[in-house]
């Protein structure tokens, strides 16, 4: 139990794992998984560890997916990219823009690897991965069999996909296929983007605006460890939203397909005067209440306690119960984040 996980999670929480293995190709990943499984150890496959909270020491092998490579196919209607799961997401966004292939600019500066992007169906500023995903290539860990899922088969939802359910432990993502249409359409529905002129705006301007919003509002994990948005934006019924808006008319709300309404978790937390609130070494970020940070050598217990406190306060005031977006990892694998902080 002497391999520190601190360098492998952006929260900077100091727990250990029995073994840590970096896999640079599919075969190395399979070998590491099969070796650990033969020894009866649990196995966790990580990208950049930017969406996990380790609750305790991990009693098994952590495999760091570093499968690289970008292939481009130029078709009349779109560019098709085949991207290794271990590629850094933001670097991919920058690369596609430099090469004149826009479409990912709203997703700039999302931390993590390409392989993690479909698991969460990452999204920001009005765009989700499912908008550009063509397929996801996986390998079945027990057999080494390769499987390609179409975007539809990935069953994408809000911060959700098949990879959080039946594909969670049996498969590893090795590559993601993206389709970037040549007829670029800007998405300018959120934040500062609403001020841009859709008729003249360029992809680079959207990218710059997104980077500006993220860097001014969000803490740098190198300075204060964090895992980005800690909570999901809650999606509530039309009735619940109507009652809440009657009482709090300024609450940001985004009607969804099917009649439900998405609320802004950061706003709900902010209304409870929780910005800057600290428990142990963990704190609510002063600029963006949705982010919990490692202010001062936080222990995982500090983060859990703080998340519980935030959830209670928001629940008591608004009767809306927040769910973590961050994935909680126990000694032998993922555990329910909601149960942990309830």
From Swiss-Prot:
Its cofactor is FAD. It comes from the Bacteria. Signal peptide: none annotated. Its EC number is 1.3.1.98. The keyword Cytoplasm applies. Coiled coil: none annotated. It is an enzyme of class 1 (oxidoreductase). It catalyses: UDP-N-acetyl-alpha-D-muramate + NADP(+) = UDP-N-acetyl-3-O-(1-carboxyvinyl)-alpha-D-glucosamine + NADPH + H(+). GO terms for cellular component: cytosol. Cell wall formation. Belongs to the MurB family. This is UDP-N-acetylenolpyruvoylglucosamine reductase. The lineage of its organism: Bacteria, Pseudomonadati, Pseudomonadota, Gammaproteobacteria, Enterobacterales.
């Amino acid at each position: 139990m002497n391999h520190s996980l601190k360098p492998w999670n952006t929260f900077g929480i100091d727990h250990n794992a029995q073994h840590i293995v970096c896999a640079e190709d599919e075969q190395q990943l399979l070998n590491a998984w099969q070796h650990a499984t033969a020894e009866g150890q649990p196995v966790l496959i990580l990208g950049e560890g930017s969406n996990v909270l380790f609750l305790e020491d991990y009693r098994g092998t952590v495999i760091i997916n570093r499968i690289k490579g970008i292939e481009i196919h130029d078709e009349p209607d779109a560019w098709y990219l085949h991207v290794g799961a271990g590629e850094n997401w933001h670097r991919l966004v920058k690369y596609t823009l430099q090469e004149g292939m826009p479409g990912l600019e709203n997703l700039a500066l999302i931390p993590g690897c390409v392989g993690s992007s479909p698991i969460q169906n990452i999204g920001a500023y009005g765009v989700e991965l499912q908008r550009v995903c063509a397929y996801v290539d996986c390998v079945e860990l027990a057999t080494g069999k390769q499987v390609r899922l179409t975007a539809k088969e990935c069953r994408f939802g809000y911060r959700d996909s098949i990879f959080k359910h039946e594909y969670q432990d049996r498969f590893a993502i090795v590559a993601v296929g993206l389709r970037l249409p040549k007829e670029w359409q800007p998405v300018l529905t959120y934040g500062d983007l609403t001020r841009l002129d859709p008729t003249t705006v360029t992809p680079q301007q959207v990218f710059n605006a997104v980077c500006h919003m993220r860097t001014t509002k969000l803490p740098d994990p190198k300075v204060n460890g964090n895992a980005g948005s800690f909570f999901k934006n809650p999606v509530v019924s039309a009735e619940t939203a109507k009652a809440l808006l009657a009482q709090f008319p300024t609450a940001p709300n985004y009607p969804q397909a099917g009649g439900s309404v998405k609320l802004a978790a950061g706003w709900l937390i902010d209304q409870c005067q929780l910005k800057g609130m600290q428990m142990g070494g963990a704190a609510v970020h002063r600029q963006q209440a949705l982010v919990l940070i490692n202010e001062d050598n936080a222990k995982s217990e500090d983060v859990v306690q703080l998340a519980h406190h935030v959830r209670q306060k928001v629940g008591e005031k608004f009767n809306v119960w927040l769910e973590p977006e961050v994935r909680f990892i126990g000694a032998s694998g993922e555990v329910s984040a909601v149960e942990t902080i309830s």
